[in-house]
Design a protein with these regions (language model features):
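Catalytic alpha/beta core domains of metabolic enzymes, predominantly
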Residues: 1-111, 125-128, 135
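Short flexible coil/turn linkers enriched for glycine and charged/polar residues
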Residues: 188-189, 199-201
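Single conserved hydrophobic/aromatic residue that forms the stacking wall/gate
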Residues: 213, 220-222
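Conserved, mostly hydrophobic/aromatic
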Residues: 34, 115, 216
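A structural micro-motif recognizing beta-strand termini
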Residues: 200, 206-212
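Short acidic/histidine-rich active-site segments
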Residues: 111-120
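Anionic-ligand-binding alpha/beta catalytic cores of soluble enzymes and soluble regulatory domains
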Residues: 14, 30, 123-189
Length: 222
């Protein structure tokens, strides 16, 4: 369903599915799928034509150039006055994160979570998927808590992100904008190589090492 919905609206749709017995080809009630985590388009649901207009690459065909992530100023055509929103990127929303209210998300009837991970690293995908899997298991076991949700959110913040917010699901009236052009990850990594193959039977990985050489300073050579 659309990311502009709030939890109350999602629950109403879920209740109607059950009340009206709206079923899929399997004969079982259709499941509600919602975006749960990842980058948000300035158009929220992705119907954006900025990339197509400026670069000839359509976001609606999976080829977005993400020029909305750049820094922009707002100019008044009548007066020519320029307004800069300090510390914010006007067209770049923060990333969606539903971990802090995932229990309410599930209570509203959401049964399939969609994670936005286009052009993200394997590390990003692994971290996000395993974190949400752990949170869902905690909800199922009755051990989900705000304290654990805070720990999971910190874990998610270690990989690529533009800051987090809960989207419109909790009734936010306006979008929260990112304060950075790139990643706001709390942990910096050094790229040392790429795993090119893994031989499962013998437990051996083949790694292409990428070494970056920098000349030592005179102080280092003393």
């Amino acid at each position: 369903l659309a990311r502009e919905l709030n939890l109350g609206q999602i629950l109403q749709i879920y209740d109607n599915i059950l009340a009206q017995r709206i079923c899929g080809p399997s004969g079982r009630p259709v499941k509600i799928e919602m975006f749960a985590h990842g980058a948000l388009c300035m158009g929220i649901s992705g119907k954006c034509y900025l990339s197509l207009h400026e670069c000839g690459e359509s976001a609606n065909r999976g080829a977005c150039r993400q020029i909305c992530r750049r820094s922009y100023e707002l100019r008044d055509r009548d007066t020519g006055e320029t307004i800069a929103v300090e510390g914010r990127y006007l067209l770049s929303p923060k990333d969606l994160c539903t971990i802090p209210f995932l229990d309410r998300f599930i209570e509203a009837g959401v049964r399939v979570l969609k994670i936005e991970g286009r052009a993200r690293s394997a590390e990003y995908v692994k971290r996000v998927v395993e974190t949400y899997d752990e949170a869902l298991r905690a909800i199922e076991e009755g051990t989900y808590s705000p304290e654990r949700a805070a720990v999971w959110t910190e874990r998610l913040a270690e990989v690529f992100n533009r800051g987090f917010w809960g989207g419109y699901y909790q009734g936010a009236p306006v979008v929260e904008l990112s304060a950075n052009y790139g990643s706001s990850a709390t942990v910096r990594k050094v790229y040392v190589g790429k795993i090119t193959n893994f031989f499962k039977k013998i437990g051996v990985a083949e790694i292409q090492v990428c070494l970056l050489y920098t000349s030592p300073s005179p102080r280092d050579m003393r």
